[in-house]
Amino acid sequence: MATINPPAGNASAVQTLRDAVRSNEEIHLARGTWIIDDQIDMAGICGKITADVEAIIRLPQNTKREGFLLRNLSKPLVFEPKKVVSETTFKGQEAPFYIINQGNVTIRGADISGIQYGHAISVRNTKDGDECKFVTIANCKIQARQVDERVNADERTTAIAVNGTLEFETGYSSPNRQYVALHKPPRVVKPISYPIITNNDITGGYYAIELSGVHGGHITYNWMKLNTRGLSMQNSSVSNQVRYNNVIDNISAAIHCAYGAVGNIIEFNNIESTRAEGEGLLQAYVGSTGNIFRGNRVSCNTEGDTRPKYMLYCAVDSGSNVFEANYLNGSAKNALIGVESDWSNTINLAYHRSYRASNDDNNMAGDHMRAVSICRNVFRDGTPYRAILLSSVNGKKLSDIYCYGNVIPSGLTNDFIGKENISQVFNVQGF
């Protein structure tokens, strides 16, 4: 192993590191400050990078991207930095660690702070690039700028972003706009497969962990705090396993599936929030089918009109989802459980998701919705006086809603919108 010293006088360390990874199979970053004022292409023969406990990697203020560009590696790479401080406010920043078209990379034990734009760790595929498989992000501590729904999309930060390559229909570049018009999610032409994201401590960011076009991932034992959204699985993310995570004081969805997320397992996670709002804390919507939400523990102490609309939520072309044995303590504004076939702001009922909403999401559904199971869940609060809401609007029928064994506080009632278009409902009082 070669021990490399940082340049004297806070000079740029970019060339020093470029040379080191090309000539050494293992390198160790000595104590001191490592100034990274450009993107470093880390292609070379190096297979392991470690750092002294007093080695600080610093990304200074800049007008261009900075960080480690991990691609075209000759062998698997394990990168174990200690402290990484980002000071840049460049809006085009990607990430201190940018993995693109590259598999078999491990980022472990990094303490990353100061993320103002972009991501802390970004994993991407391009359509014509190499397969990106078996990336591991473990034991990292990440701090990103806190943002909310009102921040423009290009200013939202994400702690860990994993994005496969999507292909949209001609004329569309947004999953939401394509689904409204065509009722189909984007196609994944190059997924990112089998990532492992485990035991990370994440504070802030619009998303703590964002999965888009990801297949077969394992997301476990992470702490996500003060995020707008904790964990998002979108854009045809398939067969991911999300277990034993903690989502604390999120604003919007804690864990959600959307736009073609299929066959994901979300179980044994802990969610606690005193500031949650939005649709629901656990949710599958907009073309998300066959997902299982099981054994999760959810506590929401938000009060008044800022409460989330639902605790569990399933809507819009999202059949065959299972909500089983979840423990939910707290209240929601509209109903504890919401199952809705479509959205329409013409429905003049405050407990419908799109009540007084914009026209943007009207008529989102492309088909009828069926086969939602809500079984053996435990609810521990008496508000909002509505336990289960079943809603059929815009002629999109709702059927085969199977409920059994739920423990619901006494005094709660169930409610229905478009009851004439709802059928095959089992064990829902009042139907």
Positions of predicted regions on the chain:
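Extracellular parallel beta-helix/beta-solenoid repeat domains
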Residues: 15-28, 32-431
